[in-house]
């Protein structure tokens, strides 16, 4: 194996990977929806608080009108913080706009709508109670705001905003629900305080649900659609099972999810953004994936609560509604939550991606530009791999020098490839040429290349981040194809500096000639940040290789003169 062959293999692996990602796209414009599934609890599982066995479809609503509080039409409350604008009714967050993330870079662009009450593609977060022993519970419209007709806005001198709702039953049981928002945070604390002023025990359990109808844009894969490359679906985490996920298009494979988990969390992911329910630490919950009509549901159901007369209790959970910001996610101190930034389902590749992002973020804090941070990353990687690269370039320079002799050997032995190979290996041994010298530096770049691709696709910090001039968003393709064209030129020039092995198969030689064009076309569809990485990396490689060849040539001429003397 030689350097040229390794480069050919690397190129084909890259192209094959991208074609594989594109091959899996959904051909249909609509998602085939399975019927609602009824999921039961495995009987052998036991928890400190038993989780009831009920269906995983629509949220149960009590039918005993004598036990359910009156259900007047509840007004929708508007809440605005420095990062979120929401509509909520006490039972659900119906809509959520991310104020710091416009849909485009156009002036006056509207913010991203993560949760939405769009009737075609609704997406909401809901929490409520399910009765046991005929205890009264609030239904979809019985949480009333403590102050009606009021909109809430986080003032400039406030760091926290509390939005309270209340439900009261005829038998004296009441629940006060508060939504607590903090400045700069996307995690919302939702707390229920249950007080039993009646004469009979109150029994119920809490559920927390994410429900959405996926839009076709995230289901149909295409090389020109970065949203479709990013993982879209449900993910969950537990101490025992670790990080697990299920794509929307495979939502009910293997019978959905029906598992009791202590602690953990459950979330719905899309490109750059996610929602997640995070229960109290170590609280045992039943985790469910289900479908109800066209809706995909991710739900957790908490333990049953019994509140005796004259007693009170409290339960709370966090709801994340926002971007995949690594720094903010880390501050939540929730184990495994950083995996929502889904660099890869494979742990090793995910770790490489996390390491690359850590370097990029620190470079960005110094250079104040993500594009220059990518350039800086390339420089650091080239420095780190220079000892390996030096051996590669030295081997290439030697092979270039002895190329005429290899051609003579080829002409001498003609069609006898076995004798030619033996003579070639003897020459390599005599002149201390390592034909494998260029393999390892190229192979070691492969996981870095693919990990960086996912870093650029997944990192919301780079969304709409400019570099300079025509590159105004590093996560989208080069609009004028300048970087892909530069990549073609650099690869062509590198090929001219790299000696073609004398015994190389003619077909492989022709493939190597068109490889710059293939790579250039491929780079036209990848994020411009990745194309920038490849152009800078290739440019530095070309300069170093040119310098090493001339250095070796000067060294060889000097040794020849010394030998003559």
UniProtKB/Swiss-Prot annotation:
Main localization category: membrane
Transport listed as a keyword: yes
Transferase in keyword set: no
Transmembrane segments: 6-26, 348-368, 370-390, 437-457, 479-499, 516-536
Membrane topology: Multi-pass membrane protein
A Pfam short name: YidC_periplas
Protein location: Cell inner membrane
Keywords: Cell inner membrane, Cell membrane, Chaperone, Membrane, Protein transport, Transmembrane, Transmembrane helix, Transport
GO biological process terms held by the UniProt record: protein insertion into membrane; protein transport
A Gene Ontology term for the protein's cellular component: plasma membrane
Family: Belongs to the OXA1/ALB3/YidC family. Type 1 subfamily.
PANTHER family, alphabetized: CYTOCHROME C OXIDASE ASSEMBLY PROTEIN COX18, MITOCHONDRIAL, OXA1
Name of the protein this chain belongs to: Membrane protein insertase YidC
Organism: Xylella fastidiosa (strain M12)
Gene name tied to this protein: yidC
């Amino acid at each position: 194996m030689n350097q040229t062959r390794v480069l050919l293999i690397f190129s084909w692996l890259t192209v094959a990977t991208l074609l594989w990602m594109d091959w899996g796209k959904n051909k249909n414009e609509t998602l085939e929806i399975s019927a609602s599934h009824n999921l039961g609890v495995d009987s052998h599982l036991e928890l400190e608080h038993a989780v009831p066995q009920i269906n995983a479809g629509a949220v149960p609503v009590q039918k005993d009108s004598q036990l359910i509080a009156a259900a007047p039409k509840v007004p929708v409350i508007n809440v605005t913080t420095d990062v979120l604008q929401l509509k909520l009714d006490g039972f659900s967050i119906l809509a959520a706009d991310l104020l710091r993330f416009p849909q485009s870079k156009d002036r006056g662009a509207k913010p991203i709508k993560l949760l939405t009450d769009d009737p075609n593609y609704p997406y909401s977060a809901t929490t409520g109670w399910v009765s046991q022993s005929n205890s009264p519970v609030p239904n979809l419209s019985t949480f009333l705001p403590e102050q009606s007709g009021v909109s809430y806005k986080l003032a400039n001198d406030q760091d926290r905003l509390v939005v309270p709702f209340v439900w009261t039953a005829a038998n004296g049981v009441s629940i006060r629900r508060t939504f607590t928002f903090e400045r700069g945070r996307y995690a919302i604390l939702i707390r229920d305080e249950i007080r039993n002023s009646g004469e009979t025990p109150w029994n119920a359990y809490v559920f927390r649900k994410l429900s959405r109808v996926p839009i076709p844009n995230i289901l149909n894969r295409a090389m020109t659609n970065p949203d479709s490359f990013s993982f879209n679906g449900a993910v969950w985490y537990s101490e025992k099972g670790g990080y697990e996920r299920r794509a929307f298009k495979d939502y009910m494979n293997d019978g959905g999810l029906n598992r009791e988990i202590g602690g953990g969390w459950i979330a719905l992911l899309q490109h750059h953004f996610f929602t997640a329910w995070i229960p109290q630490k170590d609280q045992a919950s039943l985790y469910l994936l289900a479908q109800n009509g066209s809706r995909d549901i991710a739900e957790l159901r908490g333990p049953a609560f019994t509140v005796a007369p004259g007693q009170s209790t409290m339960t709370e959970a966090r709801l994340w509604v926002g971007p995949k910001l690594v720094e903010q996610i880390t501050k939540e101190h929730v184990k495994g939550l950083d995996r929502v930034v889904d660099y890869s389902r494979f742990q090793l590749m995910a770790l490489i991606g996390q390491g690359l992002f850590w370097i990029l973020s620190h470079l960005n804090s110094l250079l104040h530009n993500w594009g220059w941070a990518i350039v800086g990353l390339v420089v650091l990687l080239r420095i780190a791999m220079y000892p390996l690269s030096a051996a590669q370039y030295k081997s290439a320079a030697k092979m270039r020098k002895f190329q005429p002799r290899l051609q003579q050997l080829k002409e001498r032995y003609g069609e006898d490839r076995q004798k030619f190979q033996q003579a070639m290996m003897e020459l390599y041994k005599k002149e201390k040429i390592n034909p494998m010298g260029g393999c390892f530096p190229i192979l070691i770049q492969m996981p870095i290349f693919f990990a960086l691709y996912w870093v650029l696709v997944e990192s919301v910090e780079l969304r709409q981040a400019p570099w300079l001039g025509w590159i105004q968003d590093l996560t989208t393709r080069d609009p004028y194809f300048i970087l892909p064209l530069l990549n073609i030129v650099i690869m062509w020039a590198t090929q001219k500096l790299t000696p073609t092995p004398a015994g190389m198969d003619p077909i492989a030689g022709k493939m190597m000639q068109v490889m710059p064009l293939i790579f250039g076309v491929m780079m036209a569809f990848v994020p411009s940040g990745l194309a920038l990485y490849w152009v800078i990396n290739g440019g530095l490689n070309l300069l170093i290789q040119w310098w090493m060849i001339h250095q070796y040539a000067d060294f060889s001429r000097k040794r020849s003169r010394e030998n003559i003397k």
